Amino acid sequence: MGRGPSIENRKNASDAKRGKIFTKIIREIGVAARGGGGDPNNNPRLRVAMDKGLTANMSKDVIERAIKKATGELEGVEYEEIRYEGYAPGGVAVIVDCLTDNRVRTVADVRHAFSKCGGNMGTEGSVSFMFKRVGVLHFAAGADEDAISEAAIEAGADDIVVYPEDGAIDVLTAADSYHAVKEAMAAAGRTPDHAELTFRADNDIKVEGDTVLQVKKLLDMLEDLDDVQDVYSNADLGADAYA
């Protein structure tokens, strides 16, 4: 009898989260199409954004409308890209990539998050030198390590990371060879469960004690901001932070 509202509330929360994800991907598709044209075959960044949309179960019609708005075939809002950098508690480096139609609002929101959670914003370039742009092809637990490793080497991947706790595998590539490696592995029958271009820290910082919750609070707060697309850090929070 008492379960109805609980189930409905969970569904509403799930729908809201899905809507926020869609909004961010649509912005990303728009910026990519406006900057490099609406043909994904000639616009690698657009191809990445479209793949992200399809992975999130976004319909092709929604993706097509986002592209048309960006290329001027349909009326739409223009967004600009902004990157903020700073430090979380414990000296953890943080990069915040945003797409916004109101720079003043966005910087105020990001600054508030850093301040509220005990961090501080830095200047441009203050932490980004600690990260590299890489492609990541993720294979979930249970994947065939030997077969994936062989396919990755043949495809020209840079590195292979196997997670001992569950056997999941990340195949790492240089940013400029991401698409080629992904397509070569798919042709070899090794399609990843998830793939993306991202930033990875050169060295992680082990975070312990009460600082774990402080850092996680900041990262979560930044992720929840409407104008924020991606948040990267060099924090190693440990498995308990996500339990």
From Swiss-Prot:
Pfam families: TACO1_YebC_N, Transcrip_reg. It is found in: Cytoplasm. Keywords: Cytoplasm, DNA-binding, Transcription, Transcription regulation. GO terms for molecular function: DNA binding. Coiled coil: none annotated. GO terms for biological process: regulation of DNA-templated transcription. Its main location: cytoplasm. Gene3D superfamilies: 1.10.10.200, 3.30.70.980. GO terms for cellular component: cytosol. It comes from the Bacteria. Belongs to the TACO1 family. HAMAP family: Transcrip_reg_TACO1. PANTHER family: TRANSCRIPTIONAL REGULATORY PROTEIN YEBC-RELATED, TRANSLATIONAL ACTIVATOR OF CYTOCHROME C OXIDASE 1. This is Probable transcriptional regulatory protein Smal_3128. It comes from Stenotrophomonas maltophilia (strain R551-3).
